[in-house]
Every structure is written in structure tokens, then in C-alpha cells.
Amino acid sequence: MSAPRVSFVSLGCPKALVDSERIITGLRSEGYEISRKHDGADLVIVNTCGFLDSARDESLEAIGLALNENGKVIVTGCLGAEPDVIRERHPNVLAITGPQAYESVMNAVHEVAPPPPHDPFVDLVPPQGVKLTPRHYAYLKISEGCSNRCSFCIIPALRGDLVSRPINEVLREAEKLVQAGVKEILVISQDTSAYGLDIKYQEAMWQDRTVRTKFLDLSRELGEMGVWVRMHYVYPYPHVDEVIPLMAEGKILPYLDIPFQHASPAVLKNMRRPAHQEKTSRRIQAWRETCPDLAVRSTFIVGYPGETEEDFQMLLDWLDEAKIERAGCFKYEAVKGAKANDLGLEQVPEEVKEARWHRFMAKQQQISTNLLKKKVGKRLPVIIDEANGTIGKGRTRYDAPEIDGSVHISSRRPLRVGDIVTVKIEASDAYDLHGTAV
């Protein structure tokens, strides 16, 4: 009897990708096969995103495609928290579960396709679990949910309040990743710098010593594992200052992904964000004094309800002052269930949002171009993401996969994915570098 085959669609952010990895690991550990095609599989699981309307539409389209090509579909993920929306469009889905509902997903799979006889000597799963990323990097999710109440966000409604994983459990997973050959660990959560707050920074034993479930302790321990460690989704809380020396010492990468969202005090107040542009500017300056190599990435929203031209100009001025290395920008999109819908603020016309988005991107492109020019002539370590003989593409310590820039590399010797090589930077453009491996 052949093992049941499950096709899988993973949509949304890296945190959802980790959820998909966990489900697939569970399936593989029970002997299921994972299929690349819907057609011929025993069922399809669609892990959805439900944050923005565009993401909801993409999720609903993916469910429809799976129904057309297979017919047996289980839906999970953030959009699964709204089963009525899914049933209205696709009444024939077999089961719907919300985010992080791993056991419910497995139970639904068992009802459609019971697990095969299990032979642990044949159905081997890697100790680090099944990963959907390339072998040389992996996401490490340290918590679920978020206790902040930003007015534009529905993550707490979808995923609940902050629930931190025990630090010894997180470090054990990281250790397994390193043992499996992972060269770069990307730490993710909804609020990485709040790690452990919900459990009062509970202590645990790790390698015969006591460590706290806290951002600093986690950073320090990961920094001893001998791989690149990159911090994502960090709020600019004061205690983040304690981690910057670890970056200056080369323990973890000099990189912080901080979603500032805006710079205008009025807009930040309406967003209910725990930040202020003057404080963040001073904090970034202080961080760079401690770690001159630091790269800051952030995301921003333009066209938020009530945003005036003065507010937007304040954001552009802040970009000029802060000169952060990487920035993404989104045009505000109303999210069903978000508090922003009830604030009674004047909506920004779509054409104004579009114009401000272009102005923002032009400003940041100019900043990025000037900063990257300063890299020309330097020799930088680069991790290889793609290789074709002596031509390849990789990333510096200042660039995360898929969202930041790349280094386009030529080499006298064949390049291998996952290797970290020294590259002499010979040219730059708006977002990327070009150089030769030495």
C-alpha cells in the first residue's frame, strides 16, 4: 500500500512559512508523502494569509485552484480564523482551521487520508524537521502572537497575545539547524524584542547554565553557535540597546529589522505605535556609535487615515536624517476588523497614496544608492544563494533573503550555494552590489 500524498500551498509571511514547515514535518513523521502537484494527491492543504485584502484574495484564489485541480482541500492559517468568508466563496472545502492549529490540521488529514503503517527505520525525518527554505538558511520562530494593539493590525485577533517559547526549546532547535548545515538563522516572531515578557523572563537550563527567556540572553546564546544570526521584527524598546554590543563584537549580524511604520507623531499616535521619530533617530544614532557597521531595515505605511502632506513630509525628512539602509513601503489598505476603521479619520485618496508611495520610494532609492556606493572597493563576506558555475548571487551581512539587496558575483572557481566567500565590491546600483570572489 502506497503512502497517502499531500500537496501543500504556503502563503504569507515567514512566520506562516514556519507553521507550514511544522505541519509538513508532522505529516512526514507519520509517513505521508508530500506532492509538488495537486493533481494526483490525496488532498491539498492551503496555509492562508488573511492580513490585507490582497492577501485574502490570493488565499481564496489558491483555495479555488486546489479545489479545481484536486477537490479535497483543507484550509488553515490566518484566513482560517474567518471560516464564513471561506465557506461563502468555497463551500466544498473539507475542513477549516485557524493559525497555529497543528493538531486540528493533522486530525483533518487523518479523516480524509488515514496515516499509513509507520516504519521509523524507513520514514526518517531530519532532526531539525522539514524546511521549506534552502538548506543554508532557516527561520527560527521564538514566539506566537502579539500583545501590542496597533490600530491597523489584526494579528492579535488572528494569533492571540504573545506566547514565548521556552528558551531551551528554541536553542535546542537552533542547535539542530546548525548541526544540519544551516549557515544563517533568521529569528522571527511578531515582536522579537518582547520575547519572554509574557512569562516574566522565565529561567531555564541550557548546557549546564541558567539562561533567561529574554531577547538579550537569546542573542548571546545564538551568537555562540558559529553561524550568521539575523534579527527580524524588533521593536525599538530601550533594552534593544543591550544587544548592539554583540553586533559590534561580531557575535550576531549587525542588522536590525524594525517596523517603524511612520515618523509623524500624529500618525504614530493614530497607529497606536510605541515609538516617536525623535527618539528613534537618537536611538539609531546611538546604536551606530556602538556598532558603526549596523544596517537597519524597516517598513512604512503611507496614506494612513488622517495623514496630511505635512505628516508625509516629516516622514521624508526623517528618512533623510536616519539614512536607514533598507526600507519597504506599503500604501495603506483598510483591514477588516482593525481599530483604524473606527477612528473616524479622513481617508487619504488613492491617487494621493500612490503619489506618496512613489515619492517615498524615490527618496529611499536615492539614499540606498548613496550608501551602496560607499561599499565599492571593500571586501565583504557574502553567503551564496544561487550558483551557476563561476557566476552566482548572494547576500552580505546587511541583507536578508528575498526582501533586501543582492551581490552579483563572478569567480575564477566554481561557486557553491551556502558557502560564505569574500567578494571585492567593484560596482553598485540602487539596491545591489557587483563584485568578484577573491
UniProtKB/Swiss-Prot annotation:
It is found in: Cytoplasm. Residues 4-114 form the MTTase N-terminal domain. Residues 373-438 form the TRAM domain. InterPro entries: Elp3/MiaA/NifB-like_rSAM, Methylthiotransferase, Methylthiotransferase_CS, Methylthiotransferase_N, Methylthiotransferase_N_sf, NA-bd_OB-fold, Ribosomal_uS12_MeSTrfase_RimO, rSAM. Its cofactor is [4Fe-4S] cluster. Binds 2 [4Fe-4S] clusters. One cluster is coordinated with 3 cysteines and an exchangeable S-adenosyl-L-methionine. It is an enzyme of class 2 (transferase). Its main location: cytoplasm. The keyword S-adenosyl-L-methionine applies. Keywords: 4Fe-4S, Cytoplasm, Iron, Iron-sulfur, Metal-binding, S-adenosyl-L-methionine, Transferase. Disulfide bonds: none annotated. One of its GO terms (cellular component) is cytosol. GO terms for molecular function: 4 iron, 4 sulfur cluster binding; aspartic acid methylthiotransferase activity; metal ion binding; protein methylthiotransferase activity. Its EC number is 2.8.4.4. Catalyzes the methylthiolation of an aspartic acid residue of ribosomal protein uS12. This is Ribosomal protein uS12 methylthiotransferase RimO.
